[in-house]
Design a protein with these regions (language model features):
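Helix-breaking motifs and short loop linkers at transmembrane-helix boundaries and internal kinks
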Residues: 34, 66, 87-93, 231, ...
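Structural signature of the two symmetry-related core transmembrane helices
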Residues: 70-83, 266-280
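Extracytoplasmic
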Residues: 4-37, 55-58, 218-223
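Helix-to-loop junctions at the C-terminal end of transmembrane segments
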Residues: 55-66, 251-263
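Helix-loop-helix hairpin linking two adjacent transmembrane segments in secondary transporters
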Residues: 93, 122, 130-176, 221, ...
């Protein structure tokens, strides 16, 4: 594997961990900051909203910034956001830190995908992008269970401290090993909005919105659900999250390989059909 792709996947893993680990420590945060689990769930809602709305806006506003430099800045802001989360004295401050984390994370994810696809040959783009998504899925396998265990051992603040240290290490690797990448030609916002007139693009956005909404609606409250409804122990819950993450990693690799082999359209159709079958089996 190209070490540059690995570093970008590691960056995706790091930011994915802070996005997803909240599910494993939500009940700890609620108890410590004296809010209900429902109120604590706003940490997920606000994060998702800022990520979705901030990503296109921030990328558009930073088109003149060299891509590696922008990635480094985003990672440093992400590190600062973790420090802020760790030191938050109340829920309001923690919620504000989630805004900072989501904004920086949105830039890191987009840049990781675009830089990875630009590093490899056209024939390997699908696998390179798949590796980035494997990094995000890897956050489910290692980041979430490990972050949950750290939270149970030393408190939820230690979880953010761990991710902050990891993100700083990744930032150093980006500065050392990734080459500079020219900024893409600036596309006016009006031209970008015109793409919404394309029914195929709108449908693709709709599929992504529905899929992510369904995924994070259940995932945000998976720990309290497994505790109260199925009476699972912390160890059993970590195992459930591990299986979920392993499936995500396998899907990222298979999806990237299938896109290169059979084309993106066919791969998407088969994937959506499998989703439909899984829902029917429920």
């Amino acid at each position: 594997m190209d070490k540059r792709i690995f570093i970008l996947a590691l960056a995706a893993f790091t930011v994915g961990s802070v996005e997803l680990v909240i599910a494993g420590i939500l009940d700890m945060i609620a108890r410590d900051l004296r809010v209900s689990v429902g109120v604590a769930g706003q940490l997920v809602s606000v994060y998702s909203l800022v990520f979705a709305l901030g990503s296109p806006v921030l990328i558009a506003l930073t088109t003149k910034v060299e891509r590696r430099r922008l990635l480094v800045i985003a990672m440093l802001v992400f590190t600062a956001g973790n420090i802020m989360s760790m030191l938050s004295p109340n829920f309001t401050m923690l919620l504000l830190s989630r805004v900072i984390l989501a904004a920086s994370c949105s830039i890191v994810v987009v840049l990781s995908i675009t830089l990875a696809s630009g590093i490899v040959t056209p024939e390997a783009k699908g696998r390179a992008i798949g590796m980035i998504f494997m990094g995000i899925s890897g956050a489910l396998v290692l980041g979430v269970p490990l972050g949950t265990l750290i939270g149970e051992a030393w408190g939820w603040r230690a979880t953010f401290a761990f991710i902050g240290v990891l993100s700083f290490i990744v930032t150093i690797c980006i500065m050392k090993f990734l080459p500079q990448a020219a900024s893409p030609p600036k596309l006016p916002m009006r031209e970008q909005l015109r793409t919404l007139g394309n029914s195929k693009i709108v449908f693709a956005h709709l599929v992504s919105i529905l899929q992510m909404t369904g995924q994070f609606t259940i995932y945000a409250y998976i720990t309290p659900f497994l505790q109260t409804m199925l009476n699972l122990s912390p160890g059993q819950i970590s195992f459930v999250l591990l299986v979920y993450g392993l499936a995500g990693i396998a899907g990222g690799w298979i999806g990237g390989w299938a896109a290169d082999r059979f084309g993106a359209a066919r791969t998407m159709i088969v994937t959506l059909l499998l989703h439909a079958v899984a829902i029917l089996l429920l």
